[in-house]
Amino acid sequence: MNKDKQFIKSFFIRMLILLAAVIAVVVIFDPFYHYHKPLPGLKAVLTDKEYQCIGTLRTFDYDSLIVGSSVCENYNNHWFDEGFDCTTIKAIRSYGATADLSYLLDAAYESHDLEYAFYNIDPSSLSASTEPTFESTGCPMYLYDNNIFNDYAYLLNKDVLLEKLPYMLANSFIGDYDEGDSYNWAQWKYFGRDMALGMYARLPSVRDMQPETVNSVELVGNIALLEAQVEEHPETTFKFFFSPYSMLWWDNAYRSGELDAVIYNEKQAIGALLEYDNVEIYYYQDDKDVITNLDNYMDMIHFSKDINYYIYDKLAKGEERLTKENYEARLDGMYILARKIVQEEIPKYYGK
């Protein structure tokens, strides 16, 4: 009997020691950067934005952010560091919804003062829900909340211990992993006309054009979220920009009956944001040479890293900036270009 008790006691002691060792290893190396920035000698290996982004915003050293959806993942942070004399990391959410990006900005501002926010506005973000979607889309909320009692899901996670941690260590010591390429997905992707056309599920018929105010409720809410960030942080220069989606996206906007609303939403958002002294807005959607060259794209939205650099370079030079005097004309020009694309460019691939 005593031997049985001794065995059970010994077993539990060993289990506790093992669990403590596992927890210690995860806390010390912390591949999701939940507790601290990388240890000296280790690189910030960032490949899982849903798991790592929130931690980096709380624990890394930086003074500027690249904020946006998946089209921002292929920027190299070092470009912005050199071009704007700052230290940059990314605040990325695949969907790019305003509420989600505002959540990430709030997390950053809890412990950091930001000099710049390089913020990509996706058209869809202006008509998206004004409630954060992290929980509803299955993100690991134990990494997002401040409840240490549910951290066991991270600390005692087999995948973290046997996959994520070794991957981080391997990339720190082997190969030429570039920390500036955080969350970059372009390396193994193919960009070209055939790929872009193949990924485009074109609507078989043209729907009736929706009223331009169809998303008014969501639009007002999303503009308010953007204005709140700008108003609450006058020390930050917000450099908002609109990225060049391909002509296939504009064709889809027309065929789905959303084109009028897209332009209206952008006009309303831009007009509101231009009222603030700490806001600059840059517009790259209407670059015809880029958006009509499908070799730049892998689908109707996502462009190659060359286009990311092209946008960065224009931002750094202050090119294509919108003002109160010119923004309506630029957006009207985009509307005309979109209709021209439908009438002249798209028929080259799909016929009349």
PLM region spans:
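Hydrophobic membrane-insertion alpha-helices, especially the h-region
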Residues: 12-31
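Membrane/wall-proximal cationic-aromatic binding patches
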Residues: 29-90, 96-107
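Loop/turn elements at helix/coil->beta-strand transitions in domains of secreted/extracellular proteins
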Residues: 61-63, 86, 113-116, 233-238, ...
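Membrane-embedded segments
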Residues: 71-151
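Short catalytic/ligand-binding loop motif for oxyanion handling, primarily in non-cytosolic enzymes
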Residues: 74-75, 125-130, 246-251, 290-293
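Secreted/periplasmic serine-hydrolase-like ester/acetyl group-modifying domain
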Residues: 120-121, 130, 134-232, 328-352
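Conserved, well-ordered alpha-helix/loop/beta-strand core segments that scaffold catalytic motifs
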Residues: 194-276
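C-terminal regions of proteins
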Residues: 267-352
